Amino acid sequence: MRYIGAHVSAAGGVSNAPINAAKIGANAFALFTKNQRQWSAKELSEGEIEQFKANLKASGISADHVLPHASYLINLGHPEKEARAKSLEAFIDEIERASKLGLKLLNFHPGSHLKQISQNECLDNIARCINEALKRTSGVKLVIENTAAQGSNLGFDFAQLAYLIERVDDESRVGVCIDTCHAFAAGYDLRSKEAYAKTMGEFDAVIGYKFLSGMHLNDAKFGLGSKKDRHESLGKGELGLGAFENIINDDKIGEIPLILETIDESIWEDEIKILRNLEKEKL
């Protein structure tokens, strides 16, 4: 059984997200617990928290398979101390929001050096922020998303993600989310069985499948190594359905949330069915 869903809307309140996920036949989902493009947000009310938990239970979706996404504004690698501190506080708030909702994961983009400091200095900033966030929170696993090598964003190669994990004090509370579009844009091929085996063999050697805590299943508008973060609907981009067939049938991938962030939400229900149909029956 694969746990497949999409990054659904939480418009009108986070409690609507499980309802929106159930409507498209999902048994996993992602959401923003606040406006992802604003620094401040109202605290979640007790009523909203209880309604979210009730709706999640009614949907039949486990909290294990919900992958909330942190704000895009957060940059834990920021070269400036004050800006980095602001990002850290916002990050901790995101973790606490996930925890209040009874969720166990928080997906985030690692950070950007803004062409002002070296890659290693930026990665060290990110690692220090992760450790501080872990120290000040509990229960929620922090899931680092790979990036597309666009601009000055780090986390685009597996070695950078491993560098962060190696510097985290509590490895039990850190994981990785592979975004297929980002991986492809950064030069990791997933299309053929051979290419997939090579890419995931490298992932396992450098990071380890045990850290794989979620995936974003997105086709890519541009070709291999484009360094462009442009998602496409499944089978309509440069990755093609073969890549997703490889993922769905990879026995080394555990019971993790597999989340669509494809560009046409009106066909998410169909895309979930496509992914389920790609799963080969085990003898």
From Swiss-Prot:
Enzyme type, top EC level: hydrolase
EC number, UniProt record: 3.1.21.2
Binding positions (Zn(2+) 3): 182, 229, 231
Example of a GO biological process term: base-excision repair
Keyword annotations: DNA damage, DNA repair, Endonuclease, Hydrolase, Metal-binding, Nuclease, Zinc
InterPro entries: AP_endonuc_2 (IPR001719), AP_endonuc_F2_Zn_BS (IPR018246), Xyl_isomerase-like_sf (IPR036237), Xyl_isomerase-like_TIM-brl (IPR013022)
Physiological role: Endonuclease IV plays a role in DNA repair. It cleaves phosphodiester bonds at apurinic or apyrimidinic (AP) sites, generating a 3'-hydroxyl group and a 5'-terminal sugar phosphate.
Family of the protein in this entry: Belongs to the AP endonuclease 2 family.
PANTHER family: APURINIC-APYRIMIDINIC ENDONUCLEASE, ENDONUCLEASE IV ENDODEOXYRIBONUCLEASE IV
The protein's name in its UniProt record: Probable endonuclease 4
Top-level taxonomy: Bacteria, Pseudomonadati, Campylobacterota, Epsilonproteobacteria, Campylobacterales
